[in-house]
């Protein structure tokens, strides 16, 4: 790297001092500043549409002036102040096309039976006479296919050139209609008639005269060319849908029609259109668009009934409830009653007429319109439950919604089974997209769900609202196809007529405006406000302003216009240009941009396409999902904790199944097995291809990397998560733990000392129920989660209503959980168990009454009954025989016999060497090895055998047989006295003689399990809490040295946390220095045991040998948890009482909190379909922040709850949240403590007004109170990364495209990889948290040095400045050291501790045990090092 670049990032060099805004961040919910009047987000003023009339009036004058002017002007000005016409490229003479018409066959016979044909001449005359024509024709009248043909036929007759484009709102419609026209006219596809949708486009449009395309395709084409003159006729179909593309297309068409395309004809068509509004929109002084209506006479009558006309239905709601958009229980029951009335009516009609009841059933399907999937499920439950009382009515219920599978979709059209009536429960998808001929009845609740976005917060919410009359009319049109029909509207007629709106709310008034604003910038015909004011329904001025702020936040717009800050506008960046040309949300486009920067473009494209799709998974969006369906998400996520990674892996698997295998049947089987939707994946595949094509056209092309420089899987995973964090900033959340003085102590108290990473619990099981007899029944509850009973231990605590369920931790057990990988220490079974509770909160279990129970256990001799109280049987335990380290032993000498990883290895104390030799001699005596295994059936699970280890036989336990049927039987065994496992054949096993079993069967293992203390695997180097190979190899090299010493830190769950001294230091510390691990806190029980051991070892010299032995036995006995007795339960016919267990629950369950200002006080949920829906503290020993990034955030209707969707759990790296905010925020202030000696928080966002200090975008300001030390060199690294990201796309204003060569990109890519690795691998010391009520205030500091800006005001990521830290005051240092010394003195105090505070860590200490354990935390030990304190 050039020295100039390095000097630029050197903060020791002199800076030019200028006034500059600063920044600050916070990611821990428990320490965020409390919400005060100062920190609350000021309510942004809603500014309406008062700005519109002036701009519209100016536009009207322009239109009138232009249309009056016969002489075209030569220049076109691109502002509203002075717009002229430009007829370059516009034909003033009539263009002939006779040769073209001779090449193709033109059959002029049109279908005269279509209702539109009657209006043919009127339509053509109007088109010839007017620039704009409005055609209103009901669905099925033929307008979409016939009107363009009428125009083309006229061109053929006259020989005039014709080029017609017809827009459709959906791709499938454009394709199918174009194909239908080609078939009707017998034209070859992609000749006279063609279509263009995304990637589906003809290789050449030279011969195309009739083009069907999506609205977006035409819009982008017109924005790029800025003229309509490439077409003679533009037909805008389905104008009533009023999506943003259509509304913006109307703006562009009207503007270009007035400026440079006056001879182009515009035809607007729709079935349900507000013709007057459209006519007014295109009216000028000299021209009023004519409105032509084409009716569609129905063959069968439709009767409409309203709620107040249904006298036989007894409505129970209050009058006021009828005005609220909702469906209550009475509404559901009323719908079922209507179904009953319909059935009775048809039975009576069958008696009086020739139409049989069975025939009426076949054509008498009922279509019920409901607002969402949840309401569909509730309606189905009500129909099923209410009709159980009437066995004469048989119904076949079909659900119909946008995410349904193709199989379910076919059920909608198939006839019901004989004797059944088909009931279709549908959302508004059946309004127009699906037509079912056999529907004779519609029950319409007149409701719909509308997605509304608050532009100030960018939160979206799905709101239940009344449908428009236009919607209801379309719904009513679903009946009367084969016979007369009835429509039942579940509202009063007066309410329908007076209160319900005629049309729905246009997208431009309720959806994000980012793409429209960017298109306005690309159009270059005025500011976004001037352009959007011309919309058919102009948005509020405040919505445009908020959108511009959001676009500045994502890097689409600069803060300034021509170098001057403008709150209502901003120059478009090259990022903004890319975003405007990709058919995606701006944040998904940002994902692709960052993917290009880090050369992970393909991954970014796949994820962006997947996030744009709905329904990749079957049952997505349902209230409950099957266990198998939900856990497929985890399989695809592969321990990443990311819905986005899961999407990427689903797609890659799909490609492998479809493109490589080329077997449709295998793909279908795969989709069913993994509960994914092939239809959605096919649509996603098309979008992926389109995005690749668009990126190539934009110059976004990945480059080949030398194989030696390719990313490894782990590095790729980390970089991908960094990209995700950058793309979706500031949709950041943190996992929040229980807010109490000792949250980790509460975890273990909740589960009575069990391992929280393997244990869940039920409640509501009273001690009187004698739970030990029902352990197998409790294990059976987990069958729905596919957890085998043999992997479960069930225990109880005396006097408690809790049932503890612990999952065995054994990598060798055959279990489907192996396929489910999760990050952190928590076992996947815990996630499965908690998920069970989320689906159903109570679990029934059948038990006996107490009297019957006592008789039962006494008759069978199960345990003892003493004084009317049952004592369960117990397993004998001789703790003095255990090989566990004594409480008085600090250092133990011995051998490491087996290494699975640095987190699990086995140690054999030297004191057992002679015992091991003796046993080996006995086991390998010839007379003991005669019992060969002849029959594989003689080997059973859990059986003790003699197994060959190296050259000798040792005692071993059979784990399980190998699941191989086509070769000789083999068995997995564990060597009891060494800890290792092996797969052995029958020839390598011997049955153990009875005398050996009697002698050694109950002897505990002569090894104990260990793990390295104070360290855990580095998330940057290895994932899923797995230790990297290099770390394990280092430990193995130590083990090969033979006898070593280990230092026992603690003992918990019979696992010793140890330190291993070496010549060059402790191996635990060496792994941290080699960046193979990172420092971590020991969890609560480990620190508690360590404190107990320390105090016992300090008192050992005062105790006799006998006393020490007695204390050690008591200690080891206290370390043993209750054991699962696994007693057979009583027969079910004797269990007449049902107990509802509540759970399972985990003490590690945690919630989330948003770190942006507007969301910090709201409750946060995770989408039920996310892999993070079960959110646990996967590393409970860590007390630093864990960051979660969401693709989108949805707000509840009441505004109190946020739901995070498309979530990704970020790597467990200290300070990761703070680093990502600093890396990807527009600007920030790094705030110091009062003494100015350390950085304590970060405030990030768009910054503030340098004069008033008011934040530009207060709602999205981000605050993180730091829990690790951020130093000056961290900011240097971050500035370098920001510089390199900017350099990829930098261009001067007059330049069209960036001018970065491939070689420069490769160099930037290499530098970015190195810098990211250095940033994330750094071992950062912990620090105490600081809070302030002024955390959200942007501070003004004229003395702050402002770094030179290499890209000036055209930087998307400007350089961060920071305040220089001060040296710690000596007086304060002495004060802190005195406080430390005092705490250590109180450590051995046995009485009641007066409340005191650790001033190093800002921690209140209320008891001596709490003080002792606090002194052992990494935070406190780091702080002691920082002040150079040494405890004497």
From Swiss-Prot:
Protein residues bound to ATP: 137-144
Catalytic activity: ATP + H2O = ADP + phosphate + H(+)
Function: Probable ATP-binding RNA helicase which plays a central role during spermatogenesis and oogenesis by repressing transposable elements and preventing their mobilization, which is essential for the germline integrity. Acts via the piRNA metabolic process, which mediates the repression of transposable elements during meiosis by forming complexes composed of piRNAs and Piwi and govern the methylation and subsequent repression of transposons. Involved in the repression of LTR retrotransposon copia.
Annotated source species: Drosophila erecta (Fruit fly)
Gene name of the encoded protein: spn-E
SUPFAM superfamilies in the cross-refs: P-loop containing nucleoside triphosphate hydrolases, Tudor/PWWP/MBT
Domain Helicase C-terminal: 337-524
Protein's name in the database: Probable ATP-dependent RNA helicase spindle-E
GO terms under cellular component: nucleus; P granule
């Amino acid at each position: 790297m050039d020295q100039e670049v390095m000097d630029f990032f050197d903060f020791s060099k002199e800076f030019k001092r200028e006034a500059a805004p600063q920044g600050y961040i916070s990611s821990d919910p428990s320490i965020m500043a409390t919400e005060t009047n100062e920190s609350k987000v000021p309510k942004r003023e809603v500014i309406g549409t008062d700005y519109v009339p002036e701009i519209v009036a100016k536009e009207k004058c322009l239109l009138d002036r232009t249309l009056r002017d016969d002489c075209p002007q030569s220049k076109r000005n691109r502002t509203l102040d002075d717009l002229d016409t430009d007829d370059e490229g516009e034909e003033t003479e009539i263009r002939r096309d006779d040769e073209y018409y001779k090449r193709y066959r033109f059959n002029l016979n049109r279908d005269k039976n279509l209702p539109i044909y009657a209006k043919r001449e009127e339509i053509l005359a109007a088109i010839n006479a007017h620039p704009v024509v409005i055609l209103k024709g009901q669905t099925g009248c033929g307008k979409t296919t016939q009107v363009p043909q009428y125009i083309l036929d006229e061109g053929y007759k006259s020989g005039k050139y014709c080029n017609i484009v017809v827009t459709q709102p959906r791709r499938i419609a454009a394709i199918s209609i174009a194909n239908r026209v080609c078939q009707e006219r017998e034209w070859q596809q992609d000749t006279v008639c063609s279509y263009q949708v995304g990637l589906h486009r003809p290789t050449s449009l030279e011969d195309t005269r009739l083009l069907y395309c999506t609205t977006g395709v035409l819009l982008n084409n017109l924005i790029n060319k800025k003229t309509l003159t490439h077409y003679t006729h533009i037909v805008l179909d389905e104008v009533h849908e009023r999506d943003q593309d259509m509304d913006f297309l109307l703006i562009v068409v009207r503007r270009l029609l007035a400026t440079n395309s006056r001879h182009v004809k515009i035809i607007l068509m729709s079935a349900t259109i507000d013709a007057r509004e459209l006519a007014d929109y295109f009216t000028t002084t000299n021209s009023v668009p004519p409105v032509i209506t084409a009716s569609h006479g129905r063959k069968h009558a439709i009767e409409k009934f309203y709620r107040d006309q249904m006298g036989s239905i007894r409505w129970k709601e209050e009058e006021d409830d009828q005005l609220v958009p909702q469906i209550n229980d009475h509404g559901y029951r009323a719908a079922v009653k209507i179904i009953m009335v319909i059935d009775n009516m048809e039975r009576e009609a069958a008696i009086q007429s020739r139409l049989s009841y069975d025939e009426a059933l076949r054509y008498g399907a009922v279509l019920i319109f409901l607002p969402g999937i949840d309401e569909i499920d509730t309606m189905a439950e009500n129909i099923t439950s209410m009709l159980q009382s009437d066995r004469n009515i048989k119904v076949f219920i079909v659900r119909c919604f946008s995410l349904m599978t193709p199989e379910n979709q076919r059920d909608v059209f198939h006839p019901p089974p004989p004797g059944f009536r088909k009931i279709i429960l549908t959302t508004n998808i059946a309004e127009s997209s699906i037509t079912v001929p056999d529907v004779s009845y519609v029950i319409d609740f007149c409701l719909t769900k509308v997605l509304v976005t608050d532009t100030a917060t960018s939160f979206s919410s799905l709101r239940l609202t009344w449908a428009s009359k236009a919607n209801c009319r379309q719904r009513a049109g679903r009946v009367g196809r084969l016979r007369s029909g009835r429509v039942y509207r579940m509202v009063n007629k007066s309410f329908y007529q007076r209160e319900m709106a005629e049309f729905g709310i246009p997208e431009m008034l309720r959806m994000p405006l980012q793409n429209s604003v960017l298109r306005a910038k690309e159009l270059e015909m005025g500011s976004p406000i001037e352009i959007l004011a011309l919309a058919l329904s102009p948005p509020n001025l405040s919505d445009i302003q908020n959108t511009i702020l959001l676009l500045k936040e994502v890097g689409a717009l600069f803060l300034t216009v021509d170098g001057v800050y403008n709150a209502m506008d901003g120059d478009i960046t090259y990022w903004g240009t890319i975003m405007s040309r990709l058919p995606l949300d701006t944040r998904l486009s940002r994902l692709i941009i960052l993917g290009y920067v880090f050369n992970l473009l393909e991954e970014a494209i796949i994820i962006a396409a997947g996030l744009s799709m709905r329904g990749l998974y079957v049952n997505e969006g349902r209230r409950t999902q099957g266990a198998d369906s939900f856990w497929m998400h985890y399989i695809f996520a592969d321990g990443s904790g990311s819905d986005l990674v899961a999407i990427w892996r689903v797609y890659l698997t799909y490609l492998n199944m479809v493109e490589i295998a080329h077997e449709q049947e295998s793909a279908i089987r795969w989709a069913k097995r993994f509960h994914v939707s092939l239809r959605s994946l096919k649509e996603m595949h098309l979008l992926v291809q389109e995005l690749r094509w668009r990126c190539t056209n934009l110059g976004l092309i990945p480059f080949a990397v030398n194989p030696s420089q390719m990313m490894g899987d782990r590095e790729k995973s980390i970089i991908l998560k960094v990209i995700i964090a950058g793309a979706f900033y500031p949709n950041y959340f943190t996992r929040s733990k229980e807010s109490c003085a000792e949250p980790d102590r509460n975890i273990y108290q909740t589960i009575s000392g069990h391992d929280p990473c393997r244990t869940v619990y039920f409640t509501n099981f009273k001690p009187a129920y004698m739970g030990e007899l029902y352990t197998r029944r409790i294990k059976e509850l987990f069958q729905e989660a596919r957890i085998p009973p043999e992997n479960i231990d069930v225990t109880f605590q005396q006097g408690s209503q809790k049932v503890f369920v612990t999952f065995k931790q054994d990598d060798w057990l055959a279990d489907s959980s192996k396929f489910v990988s999760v990050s952190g220490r928590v076992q996947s079974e815990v996630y499965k168990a908690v998920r069970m509770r989320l689906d159903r909160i109570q679990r029934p279990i059948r038990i006996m009454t107490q009297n019957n129970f006592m008789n039962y256990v006494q008759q069978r001799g199960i345990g003892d009954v003493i004084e009317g109280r049952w004592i369960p049987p117990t397993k004998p335990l001789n703790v003095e025989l255990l090989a566990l380290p004594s409480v008085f032993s600090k250092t133990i000498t011995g051998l490491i016999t087996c290494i699975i990883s640095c987190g699990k290895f086995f140690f054999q104390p030297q004191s057992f060497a002679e015992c091991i030799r003796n046993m080996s001699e006995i086991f390998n005596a010839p007379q003991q090895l005669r019992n060969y295994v002849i029959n594989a059936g003689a080997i059973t699970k859990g059986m003790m055998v003699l197994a060959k280890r190296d050259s000798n036989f040792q005692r071993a336990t059979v784990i399980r047989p190998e699941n191989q049927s086509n070769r000789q039987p083999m068995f997995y065994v564990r060597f009891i006295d060494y800890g290792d496992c092996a797969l052995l054949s029958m020839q390598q096993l011997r049955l153990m003689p009875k005398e050996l079993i009697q002698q050694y069967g109950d002897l505990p293992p002569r090894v104990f399990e260990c793990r390295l203390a104070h360290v855990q695997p580095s998330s940057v180097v290895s994932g899923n809490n797995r230790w990297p190979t290099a770390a394990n190899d280092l430990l193995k090299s130590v083990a090969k040295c033979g006898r070593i010493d280990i230092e026992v830190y603690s003992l918990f769950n019979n696992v010793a946390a140890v330190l291993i001294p070496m010549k060059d230091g402790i191996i635990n510390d060496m792994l941290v220095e080699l960046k193979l691990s990172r420092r971590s806190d020991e969890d609560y029980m480990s620190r508690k045991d360590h404190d107990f051991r320390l105090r016992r070892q300090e008192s050992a010299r005062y105790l006799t040998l006998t006393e020490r032995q007695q204390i050690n036995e008591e200690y080891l006995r206290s370390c043993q948890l209750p054991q699962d007795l696994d007693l057979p339960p009583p027969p079910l016919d004797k269990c007449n009482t049902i107990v509802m267990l509540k759970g399972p629950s985990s003490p590690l369950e945690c919630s989330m909190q948003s770190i942006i200002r507007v969301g910090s006080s709201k409750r946060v949920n995770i989408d039920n379909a996310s892999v993070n829906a079960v959110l646990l503290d996967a590393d409970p020993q860590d007390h630093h922040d864990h960051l979660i990034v969401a693709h989108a955030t949805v707000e509840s209707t009441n505004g109190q709850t946020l739901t995070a969707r498309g979530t990704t759990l970020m790597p467990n790296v200290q300070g990761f949240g703070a680093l990502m905010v600093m890396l990807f925020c527009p600007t920030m202030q790094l705030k110091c403590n009062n003494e100015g000696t350390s950085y304590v928080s970060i405030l990030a966002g768009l910054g503030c007004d340098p004069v008033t200090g008011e934040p530009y975008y207060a709602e999205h300001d981000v605050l993180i109170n730091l829990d690790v030390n951020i130093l000056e060199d961290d900011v240097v690294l971050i500035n370098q990364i920001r510089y390199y990201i900017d350099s990829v796309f930098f261009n001067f204003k007059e330049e069209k495209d960036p001018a970065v060569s491939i070689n420069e990109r490769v160099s930037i890519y290499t530098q970015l990889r190195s810098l990211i690795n250095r940033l994330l691998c750094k071992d950062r010391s912990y620090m105490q948290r600081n809070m302030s009520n002024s955390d959200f205030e942007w501070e003004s500091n004229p003395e702050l040095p402002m770094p030179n800006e290499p890209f000036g005001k055209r930087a998307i990521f400007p350089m961060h400045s920071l305040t220089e830290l001060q040296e710690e005051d000596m007086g304060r240092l002495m004060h802190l050291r005195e406080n430390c010394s005092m705490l250590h003195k109180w450590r051995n105090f046995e009485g009641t501790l007066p409340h005191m505070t650790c001033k190093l860590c800002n921690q209140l200490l209320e008891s001596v045990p709490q003080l002792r354990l606090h002194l052992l935390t990494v935070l406190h030990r780091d702080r002691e090092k920082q002040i150079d304190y040494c405890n004497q």
